[in-house]
């Protein structure tokens, strides 16, 4: 039996975020197109070289992108919206689709399955000519071969997942469009095979959650492709969960290899193999290293997995690989020497995970004695972190044990609370507000950097933050907003900020991962029990409230979002970690309330993304996610108004969960998803406070008052004006001041026009 090492995808951003910096330099015209393409090629080849040097045999090619791999596929297949037809060059069209332009909105952006990565949603339009517009995988395959002598493994997004992720067609059209994808995929695969590609990875993560009918439909497409490209060696790759429900059919697909996730789908995939076996004429690609977390693998557990598989699987070959692309992990832990030894030793970033694959390969091909020293080291590391004081706090355990049913609910129902809040807050009809953050200018970032480096004192930094806060309180008053925010100038990141102030968290210096486009985040590491230490937002919020007679809302990140946007310890259930965070936030919310803050927003933008892929697993997740939010927010008085915020999700799946949060007001992204949630509300009722975002803050364009008014008008057809709020889609941290002020002025004017119309029609 031949055993090979493989990788599914490598982080794009570069060890020092060179990729991000190159993109942003190009967008701001600091480098020209030639410089951009040259630098990107250098980064791309360096990533291939690293994997080659680590000993990976099947190196992914084509996983590198200038923005997003789904967008790459859309462009490659000609899924280019007609509104971008005025652009002629590849990069102009590509980035207009991703980011919008002065006159045109960008394509929608949403979460990649249940991760914190965002992809650009492909758009289908009537009359679209689907064809292979650009065989990018072929170019990159030949580049790696010529420049580095690497015969790589081209990686492409499969036709079924691609079309399932796209929008703009009816369900009745799906089968017809799917068949139209056969020809370009045949051409793509034929050209790769002709160029010498030994194996081609076709990603179909959607296979984890298909119906029987959909799997049959997908199989027919693969049979049509195989008929035209009989000799190409295809690896059908699944990840993020098991394919247990459809395994029996999937193993009959006309492909040479099948990749399964034995981390996030371990139980289901093992059950399926035990029941149905695995074809002797196919190669099994075993996703055995967690591609979504940062902890060292349990090598004993992984080797036990292979022992089990080798007893049950009569395959000719095995491939050792991560559970999914390493896109979701930082690149290398070597710079994180500031961390405690017990934590540093327990980590494995992308490069360390590649080394783990090689270790496992050695154990499988040469025997476990060949890695006996490494096995002993790994066992000691796991024992040390499991038994650490940080993971065994008695006070945290006692607080969890003491929870009672009444800790998870507000005293009065929403309608009665809202009446009391209206009396207390005295807000107009259709109140206006923002989501929380204001522009983090170069000056803000530079001043924070100087403070962190000890160049300026704590007092100087606090004075600067107060100056920025007062400036934006005045801007908000002049614009005419009804509920103000302090602006969050003291925060780098909405999760990192809280993690730095809670027990149980640690932070990397260079643990960046891509969120969307050039936007990178540095997730906190939850390595121990989470507990409240001191007030985290009191000082800045109370100061902002002291500057104005208007209501200022406190701003917190919710427990489920902190959980889902962190790298989380894997020794206890995620539910328990979420409850620990909720208890800490509950303390903070009580402090805000006792300090006179009457509106408190607890953001949960990541609630939806944490949902399991399989519908049968949704209820369990939603139950503890909602309970976590309620645990954090339910101890306040009825007169205190709790807000929450969500963005970029498939909301129709969680309308009931949103309702169960029992927030007094929820603000939701609407504009970039082109009114999708408004459509959802046409088929259901939402009887609590709600603000549907009236403009897309991820695009630099300033929308007109009329555009926003149109969204307000559409929203009021499905929402009760008594409970309706007007706000942007998300926080304004990434926008420039000259974009923010006119956009908010237009928004306030749209609100005034809507109020006038409502009064006229009353």
From Swiss-Prot:
L-homocysteine binds at residues 435-437, 488, 603. It catalyses: 5-methyltetrahydropteroyltri-L-glutamate + L-homocysteine = tetrahydropteroyltri-L-glutamate + L-methionine. GO terms for molecular function: 5-methyltetrahydropteroyltriglutamate-homocysteine S-methyltransferase activity; zinc ion binding. It comes from the Bacteria. Pathway: Amino-acid biosynthesis; L-methionine biosynthesis via de novo pathway; L-methionine from L-homocysteine (MetE route): step 1/1. Its EC number is 2.1.1.14. The keyword Zinc applies. Zn(2+) binds at residues 645, 647, 669, 730. InterPro entries: Cbl-indep_Met_Synth_N (IPR013215), Cobalamin-indep_Met_synthase (IPR006276), Met_Synth_C/arc (IPR002629), UROD/MetE-like_sf (IPR038071). Binds 1 zinc ion per subunit. Keywords: Amino-acid biosynthesis, Metal-binding, Methionine biosynthesis, Methyltransferase, Repeat, Transferase, Zinc. Its cofactor is Zn(2+). GO terms for biological process: methionine biosynthetic process; methylation. HAMAP family: Meth_synth. Catalyzes the transfer of a methyl group from 5-methyltetrahydrofolate to homocysteine resulting in methionine formation. This is 5-methyltetrahydropteroyltriglutamate--homocysteine methyltransferase. The gene is metE.
């Amino acid at each position: 039996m031949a055993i090979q090492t493989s990788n599914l995808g490598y982080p794009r951003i570069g060890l020092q975020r060179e990729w991000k910096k190159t993109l942003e330099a190009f967008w701001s015209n600091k480098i020209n197109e030639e410089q951009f393409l040259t630098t990107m090629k250098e980064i791309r080849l360096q990533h291939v070289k690293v994997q080659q040097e680590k000993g990976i045999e099947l190196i992914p090619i084509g996983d590198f992108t200038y923005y997003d791999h789904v967008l790459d596929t859309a462009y490659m297949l000609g899924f280019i919206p007609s509104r971008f037809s005025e652009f002629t060059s590849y990069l102009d069209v590509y980035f207009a689709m991703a980011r919008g332009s002065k006159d045109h909105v960008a394509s929608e952006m949403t979460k990649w399955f249940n991760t914190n990565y965002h992809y650009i949603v492909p758009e289908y339009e009537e009359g679209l000519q689907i064809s292979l517009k650009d065989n990018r995988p072929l170019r990159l395959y030949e580049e790696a071969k010529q420049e580095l002598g690497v015969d790589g493994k081209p990686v492409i997004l499969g036709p079924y997942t691609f079309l399932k992720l796209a929008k703009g067609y009816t369900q009745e059209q799906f089968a017809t469009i799917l068949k139209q994808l056969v020809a370009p995929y045949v051409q793509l695969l034929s050209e790769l095979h002709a160029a010498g590609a030994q194996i081609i990875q076709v990603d179909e993560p959607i296979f984890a959650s298909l119906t029987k009918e959909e799997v049959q439909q997908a199989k027919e497409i693969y049979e049509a492709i195989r008929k035209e490209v009989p000799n190409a060696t295809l690896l059908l790759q699944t990840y993020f969960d098991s394919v247990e429900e459809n395994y029996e059919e999937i193993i009959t697909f006309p492909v040479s290899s099948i990749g399964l996730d034995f981390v996030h789908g371990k139980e289901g995939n093992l059950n399926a193999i035990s029941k149905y076996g695995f074809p002797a004429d196919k190669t099994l690609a075993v996703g055995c290293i967690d591609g979504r977390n940062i902890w060292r693998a349990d090598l004993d557990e992984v080797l036990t997995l292979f022992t089990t598989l080798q007893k049950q699987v009569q395959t000719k070959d095995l491939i050792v690989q991560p559970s999914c692309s390493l896109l979701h992990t930082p690149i290398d832990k070597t710079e994180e020497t500031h961390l405690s030894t017990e934590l540093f030793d327990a980590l494995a970033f992308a490069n360390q995970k590649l080394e783990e694959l090689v270790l496992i390969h050695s154990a499988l091909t040469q025997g476990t004695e060949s890695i006996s020293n490494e096995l002993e080291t790994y066992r000691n590391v796991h024992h040390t972190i499991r038994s650490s004081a940080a993971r065994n706090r008695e006070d945290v355990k006692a607080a969890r044990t003491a929870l009672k049913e009444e800790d998870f609910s507000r005293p009065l129902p929403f309608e009665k609370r809202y009446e009391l809040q209206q009396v207390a807050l005295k807000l107009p009809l259709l109140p206006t507000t923002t989501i929380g953050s204001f522009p983090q200018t170069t000056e803000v970032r530079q001043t924070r950097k100087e403070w962190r480096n000890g160049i300026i004192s704590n007092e100087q930094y606090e004075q600067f933050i107060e100056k920025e806060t007062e400036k934006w309180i005045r801007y908000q008053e002049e614009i005419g907003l009804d509920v103000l925010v302090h602006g969050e100038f003291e925060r780098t990141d909405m999760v990192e900020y809280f993690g730095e102030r809670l027990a149980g968290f640690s932070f990397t210096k260079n643990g960046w991962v891509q969120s969307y486009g050039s936007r990178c985040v540095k997730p906190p590491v939850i390595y121990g029990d989470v507990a409240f230490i001191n007030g985290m937002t009191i000082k800045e919020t109370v100061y902002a409230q002291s500057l104005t007679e208007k209501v200022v809302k406190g701003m917190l990140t919710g427990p489920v979002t902190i959980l889902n946007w962190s790298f989380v310890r894997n020794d206890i259930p995620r539910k328990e970690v979420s409850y620990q965070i909720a208890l800490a936030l509950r303390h903070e919310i009580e402090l805000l309330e006792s300090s006179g803050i009457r509106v408190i927003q607890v953001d949960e933008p990541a609630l939806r993304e944490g949902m399991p892929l399989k519908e049968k697993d949704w209820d369990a997740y939603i139950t503890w996610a909602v309970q976590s939010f309620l645990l954090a927010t339910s101890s306040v008085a009825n007169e205190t108004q709790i807000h929450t915020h969500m963005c970029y999700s498939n909301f129709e799946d969680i309308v009931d969960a949103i309702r169960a949060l029992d927030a007094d007001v929820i603000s939701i992204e609407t504009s970039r998803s082109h009114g999708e949630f408004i459509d959802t509300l046409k088929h259901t009722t939402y009887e609590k406070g709600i603000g549907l975002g009236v403009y897309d803050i991820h695009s630099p364009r300033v929308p007109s008052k009329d555009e926003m008014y149109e969204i307000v008008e559409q929203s009021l057809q499905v929402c009760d004006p008594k409970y309706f709020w007007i706000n942007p889609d998300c926080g304004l941290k990434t926008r420039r001041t000259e974009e923010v002020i006119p956009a908010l002025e237009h928004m306030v004017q749209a609100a005034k026009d809507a109020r006038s119309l409502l009064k006229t029609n009353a």
